[in-house]
């Protein structure tokens, strides 16, 4: 069984026991989170349920396995011939989740 969930403004396709990295979610390691914004749910051999915009009664349960930071990206702005340069870096904080269960009532 698989589902498409919305987390942190992005969409993720998840299976049971899959591991995903999403934008930071506050919580301690080992705590469980439920996603009720399920956009689609289905099985590979049967037709899927597509939400309008979400599937009612569908819940995805996940466990926080790690809190980490992504690789650093460099943002560099420049205007030619004007001696204008700006350099900034950014490291996005991420949460690693293990999908435990996908249910639809």
Curated annotation (Swiss-Prot):
Q: Which keywords annotate this record?
A: Ribonucleoprotein, Ribosomal protein, RNA-binding, rRNA-binding
Output the superkingdom of the source species: Bacteria
Query: Is rRNA-binding among the key words of this record?
Result: yes
The molecular function GO annotations come to: rRNA binding; structural constituent of ribosome
Q: List the disulfide bonds.
A: none
Q: Which InterPro entries match?
A: bL21-like, bL21-like_sf, Ribosomal_bL21, Ribosomal_bL21_CS
One Gene Ontology term of the biological-process aspect is: translation
Query: Which Gene Ontology terms of cellular component type are present?
Result: cytoplasm; ribonucleoprotein complex; ribosome
Q: Does the record carry Cell inner membrane as a key word?
A: no
* Any one Pfam family match given in the protein's UniProt record, by short name: Ribosomal_L21p
Quaternary assembly: Part of the 50S ribosomal subunit. Contacts protein L20.
**Family label:** Belongs to the bacterial ribosomal protein bL21 family.
Function description: This protein binds to 23S rRNA in the presence of protein L20.
Tell me the PANTHER family matching this sequence: 50S RIBOSOMAL PROTEIN L21, LARGE RIBOSOMAL SUBUNIT PROTEIN BL21M
Name the UniProt record assigns to this protein: Large ribosomal subunit protein bL21
């Amino acid at each position: 069984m698989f589902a498409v969930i919305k987390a942190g403004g992005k969409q993720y396709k998840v299976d049971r026991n899959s591991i995903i990295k999403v934008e930071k979610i506050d919580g301690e390691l080992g705590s469980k989170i439920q996603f009720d914004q399920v956009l689609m749910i289905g099985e590979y051999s049967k037709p899927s349920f597509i939400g309008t915009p979400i599937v009612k009664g569908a819940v995805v349960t996940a466990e926080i396995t790690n809190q980490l930071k992504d690789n650093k990206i460099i943002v560099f702005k420049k205007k030619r011939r004007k001696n204008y340069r700006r350099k900034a870096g950014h490291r996005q904080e991420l949460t690693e989740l293990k999908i435990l269960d996908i249910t639809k009532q």
